[in-house]
Amino acid sequence: MTGAGSSRTFARWFRRRKAANAGGPKVALFATCSVDYNYPQVGVAAVQVLEKNGKSVEVPRVVCCGLPALDGGDLETAIGKIERNVAVLLPLVQSGTPVVVLAPSCGLMMKSEWPQLVPTDECRAVAAATMDVGEYLAKEKAAGRLDTNFTVPQGKVAYHIPCHLRAQNVGQPFRAILQSVPGTTVEAIEQCSAFDGTWGMKTEYYETSRKCAGKLCSAITVSNADKLASDCMLAGLNIVEETGCAPSHPIELMRDAYGLRQE
């Protein structure tokens, strides 16, 4: 999982490719701004994994979830983005399509903050249909609908469990999935990256953020893992800054475990 801009956006890649599994169970993929503009390969991996499991993936024309605006105290902008997204997502939700999110911070915003800021039945319905991608795949696995024919071992994986995923109370879904890959062990690291939305980006808090991420980065260093994973792209910025190692999103490791080539 690398970042710092990309020559292609995820949305552009998706709309130029041939759709798969027409008529299969639909999934609305809320890619997030980070994936669309900086980490398109995470979105590509998610599409590959979902399509491997027979899903018909749709990427609706949504806008930012509103978290950066809310983080900066701009409620008017945040509410405007929420209302716009609800209008796009509601018809999908009403047809029984789950909304699957690729970044924990955005998923937490959609599940928890959206219905508080826009307390309508429509917004509550969209929030209730929203799931983290790992949460969704774990439910598919529990229902016997997940392809578990993994063929490529991933070795020892140091897996950072982001705070905003833990706040969703969905457990550690990707940990269980990756541990089912032959030749793979997962060491979960539950330490804060101290990025905290946009807080860690600000000049006045940058050094404090780096210092607070010390426990996480030390745990990663001493793990001596073959691979490093985190669901949170923002956490990855502090991780790579302090350790020199860029984490993959767990969905990328899952794609690799299937033996699928990177598109």
PLM region spans:
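Iron-sulfur cluster-binding electron-transfer modules in prokaryotic oxidoreductases
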Residues: M1-E263
